[in-house]
């Protein structure tokens, strides 16, 4: 296994993608937020003191996709053509699954943008609900799907 973010002397580098042809790149990532079922019930009913939690988390996730190169030092600045954040809620378990999809016509993939988007949306949910539930956890941040480029299509086989 080789890591392409290092040169021959072991120094960190940004991978040179200048010789690659742009192709349509898509990635979907997920993050899981677990809270008390009553906290999620209040969130879904609009009974939070901080307003539209999922709406704000959606915007935070979209903004995060666009800001990824400022947070992940060796990621490439990309022209994002699409970013979306959706939520699947399970009221009986108090679980929210954040799903972020990013698309771009670029020379490198958008996996980091999708994962950053999902993670920041999950962190925003935590931030807006922590006053009501200190035990909220965030977990299972993972890539679910990627498409485009030399390596083609990849899909996670086991549930995240």
Curated annotation (Swiss-Prot):
Pfam families from the UniProt entry: MoaC
Active site: 127
InterPro entries according to UniProt: MoaC, MoaC_bact/euk, MoaC_sf, MoCo_biosynth_MoaA/MoaC, Mopterin_CF_biosynth-C_dom
GO MF terms, alphabetically ordered: cyclic pyranopterin monophosphate synthase activity
BP GO terms, sorted: Mo-molybdopterin cofactor biosynthetic process
Record text on subunit structure and interactions: Homohexamer; trimer of dimers.
Identification of the protein by name: Cyclic pyranopterin monophosphate synthase
Annotated organism of origin: Geobacter metallireducens (strain ATCC 53774 / DSM 7210 / GS-15)
